[in-house]
Amino acid sequence: MSESVHAQSQPLRGVKVVDFTHVLAGPYCTQLLADAGADVIKVEPMVGDMARFMPPLGKMPDGSLLSGAEIGLNRGKRSIAVDMKSPEGRDLVIEMIDTADVVIESFAPGALLKLGIDLGAARLRRPSLITVSISLYGSHETAGELANRKGLAIIAEAESGVAWMHRDAAGKPPQQKVPFADMNTGLCAYSAIVTAMLGRERSGEGKHIDIAMVKTMLSMATVSIVGSQIYDADNPQP
């Protein structure tokens, strides 16, 4: 492959992403960024991302077990294990943030700040920095007390109404074989980051992006939600 063709196939080459996400939604987003050529550095706890232990697990030649989620969502990334509760770990993480183009995290709202890692302060130091937070309901600023509630993708699928829309004849929601809310949220985060990068090219300014899993699922249900508001039961349409 020629250099010019390779560059075209990797439009994000040279973009440094520091990735504090875990499990599925965030790692899927950063996997898409890595596929587009970004240099993604995945920051994991000392025991590793919990996705490393999610089934299905495959046995490697050395006898160790490796998760399908770990392989499928982390190809092409670099990884480092850091104890962010230690002063040394915190200082290392802040140094990494200060040299990044994009920082993305999926901790509970406010968790990084409790560790002494302030993404808002990082953006004041470097106004071009793009920061992204993924959570179930969003930040305290946008979701209020709901931000304190923790949960998994299945809650977003239920509260958005998407699970109900796919109920079976008995009215029960389906058992999803694909982590739909996680993957959709990762895709929404990816598109928001790329859009923010385009805005930065024009203005020189970065921004903070607040991604709420429930809201990404509500966006998928837009047609049904609007339809329910305009439906006239007395004059149903064919």
At which residue positions do the language-model features occur?
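A structured beta-alpha segment of the ubiquitous adenosine-cofactor-binding alpha/beta core
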Residues: 2-7, 62-124
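Conserved small-residue-rich beta-alpha loop and adjacent elements
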Residues: 9-48, 55
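Loop/turn elements at helix/coil->beta-strand transitions in domains of secreted/extracellular proteins
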Residues: 14-15, 99-102, 127-130
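Structural scaffold positions in well-ordered secondary structure
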Residues: 17, 33, 77, 104, ...
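Glycine-rich phosphate-binding loop and adjoining beta1-alpha1-beta2 segment
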Residues: 38-79
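Hydrophobic/aromatic beta-strand patches that form the interior of the parallel beta-sheet core
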Residues: 41, 80, 130-132, 209
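Acidic, glycine-rich segments within the central catalytic cores of soluble metabolic enzymes
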Residues: 48, 61, 149, 157-238
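N-terminal Rossmann-like NAD(P) cofactor-binding subdomain of oxidoreductases
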Residues: 86, 105-164
